[in-house]
């Protein structure tokens, strides 16, 4: 779901992904190709990424301006999670969905306000993308 808002000369996009948040690094597989080990995302993560993209409507052109990507994660259980790994998953999904041109530090300049909460009834991820204006 996409919501476009404008506040005080700042454009903001809001996405809601009504799926249990997943991390890329905690669900990896090691396979061997020509005798060399290679780490790939698990089928659980690939499924999450594919399903999450159904809830993301990209803008006409990917964002190339500096933005803050705030993500609020609502987990189904109270187990400990790594916020950095969750944020990496979000930015990867946004790049693959062509919302962001890239997830480098020239475009995603911060994750200010990102948090992890508990909501057993409705696990989800709320993503707020706010344009950063140079003062």
Show which residues each predicted segment covers.
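Acidic, proline/glycine-enriched N-terminal capping motif
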Residues: 2-135
